[in-house]
Swiss-Prot record:
Phenotype when the gene is knocked out: No visible phenotype. Displays smaller nematode-induced syncytia. The UGD2 UGD3 double mutant displays a strong dwarf phenotype and often develops seedlings with severe root defects; cell walls have an altered sugar composition. Ugd2 and ugd3 double mutants display abnormal nematode-induced syncytia.
Pathway in which the depicted protein is active: Nucleotide-sugar biosynthesis; UDP-alpha-D-glucuronate biosynthesis; UDP-alpha-D-glucuronate from UDP-alpha-D-glucose: step 1/1
GO-annotated molecular function: NAD binding; UDP-glucose 6-dehydrogenase activity
Catalytic activity of the protein: UDP-alpha-D-glucose + 2 NAD(+) + H2O = UDP-alpha-D-glucuronate + 2 NADH + 3 H(+)
Top-level enzyme category: oxidoreductase
Similarity-based family: Belongs to the UDP-glucose/GDP-mannose dehydrogenase family.
Protein name per UniProt: UDP-glucose 6-dehydrogenase 2
Length: 480
């Protein structure tokens, strides 16, 4: 029986290994992590991450050919294939701070693999890493190997949170990069055989190591670029009276462009897009390509601009002050169908409103109060560095309340900011909400999911990104 071990039981490692175990009953899969609470959660009825369909997959396999353990060294020692799915956060200090990937966890994992291994292994990069990381890892393994042979493969994930299980069951492609040597080709074929249990051969792409590593960064950069492009258009639409939804539809019907990732919003979030683009910028700078680096920086700048523009719109619409006004924030996760708040636009929007002394009442069906308070009290990128959490700010705690009900969150509020496109928000009784709000009552739709005409008929003053402005909003101070 082939044995697979995955180091890292997070958003990538857990679901990916669960699906491999389900689709490959003849393969034994162990997911290991040094975090005892996380592994305990994976072994319980309440998994540590929310992902539609994940519970069912885990329950079918757990205890049969899928195991979760904190005994990292044992399972690495016994494995034929070791996936490494550890954090590669953005550095917060030192050379490349704010841009470069911090490979501390990856290096530690590589040294441990070399130290405990007693047989040849295939080591698979599953985390998103800079180009040429495999070369560095190879050197660490080789210089500490005690004669054991390692083959390094790059097998980046292309999952979208909220649809991760669906993506794993029916991937657009599986990408495997390896050394172009007889040993490298053999290692690629071994991993290919695992995925071939359920993925058609034509959808398994093989490349050299460096192409696979760069492809992941490029894919995320291209997706984020599309979001920033349509968001840049949304600002122009508001200025001219055009409707960004109509513009996006017209553009997306061009078969050369297509309709995906053309929904205007308050901005992109999640653990990958910003981090990977900053990493790409740093790689370009290190390779003497400042013009290319500057090009990709603009994707981040537009995303930051979109969030600040949204905050400015809220403040300017409400008589240029939200001081001591209650603002209901509906949604905090970076997208629907996940509880993940990493780099969610809601953080920057909430911080912007808090700087103007607003009182926030936040509701998200999948995000805990503890998580929200922690996110609002951390500096940028600290979410990915558990050891560097900032002390909670008493001011933030005082100004923020978290509820488990949208109606409670909106009661006596002056305005509502819709920050996540949860389906349940479309079906709320907005007449009831309006009746219990301060007047004039505002809705700021940061996800373009609401029936604007219906809200206006109820009596709301409505702002939706990239849509023609209400007369009220036209009369308010201009938003830069």
């Amino acid at each position: 029986m082939v044995k697979i071990c995955c180091i890292g039981a997070g958003y990538v490692g857990g679901p990916t290994m669960a699906v491999i175990a389900l689709k490959c009953p003849d393969v034994e899969v162990a997911v290991v992590d040094i975090s005892v609470p996380r592994i305990n959660a994976w072994n319980s009825d309440t998994l540590p991450i929310y992902e539609p369909g994940l519970d069912d997959v885990v329950k079918q396999c757990r205890g049969k050919n899928l195991f979760f353990s904190t005994d990292v060294e044992k399972h690495v020692r016994e494995a034929d294939i070791v996936f490494v799915s550890v954090n590669t956060p953005t550095k917060t200090r030192g050379l490349g701070a704010g841009k470069a990937a911090d490979l501390t966890y990856w290096e530690s994992a590589a040294r441990m693999i070399a130290d405990v291994s007693v047989s040849d292994k295939i080591v698979v990069e599953k985390s998103t890493v800079p180009v040429k990381t495999a070369e560095a890892i190879e050197k660490i393994l080789t210089h500490n190997s005690k004669g054991i042979k390692f083959q390094i493969l790059s097998n980046p994930e292309f999952l979208a949170e909220g649809t991760a299980i669906k993506d794993l069951f029916n991937p657009d492609r599986v990408l495997i990069g390896g050394r172009e040597t007889p040993e490298g080709f053999k290692a690629v074929q071994t991993l290919k055989n695992v995925y071939a249990h359920w993925v058609p051969e034509g959808q398994i792409i093989t490349t050299n190591l460096w192409s696979a590593e760069l492809s992941k960064l490029a894919a995320n950069a291209f997706l984020a670029q599309r979001i920033s492009s349509v968001n840049a258009m949304s600002a122009l639409c508001e200025a001219t009276g055009a409707d960004v939804t109509q513009v996006s539809y017209a553009v997306g019907t061009d078969s050369r462009i297509g309709p995906k990732f053309l929904n205007s919003s308050v901005g992109f979030g999640g653990s990958c897009f910003q981090k990977d683009i900053l990493n790409l910028v740093y790689i370009c700078e290190c390779n003497g390509l400042p013009e290319v680096a500057e090009y990709w920086k603009q994707v981040i700048k537009i995303n930051d601009y979109q969030k600040s523009r949204f905050v400015n719109r809220v403040v300017s619409s409400m008589f240029n002050s939200v001081s001591n006004k209650k603002i209901a924030v509906l949604g905090f996760a970076f997208k629907k169908d996940t509880g993940d708040t990493r780099e969610t636009p809601a953080i920057d929007v909430c911080k912007g409103l808090l700087e103007d002394k607003a009182r926030l009442s936040i509701y998200d069906p999948q995000v805990t109060e503890d998580q929200i308070q922690r996110d609002l009290s951390m500096n940028k990128f600290d979410w990915d560095h558990p050891l560097h959490l900032q002390p909670m700010s008493p001011t933030t705690v005082k100004q923020v309340t978290v509820t488990w009900d949208a109606y409670e969150a909106t009661k006596d509020a002056h305005g509502i900011c819709i920050m996540t496109e949860w389906d349940e928000f479309k079906n709320l009784d907005f007449q009831k909400i309006f009746d219990n709000m301060q007047k004039p009552a505002f809705v700021f739709d940061g996800r373009n999911i609401m029936n604007l005409q219906k809200l206006r008929e109820i009596g709301f003053i409505v702002y939706s990104i990239g849509k023609p402005l209400d007369d009220w909003l036209k009369d308010m101070p201009a938003v830069a």
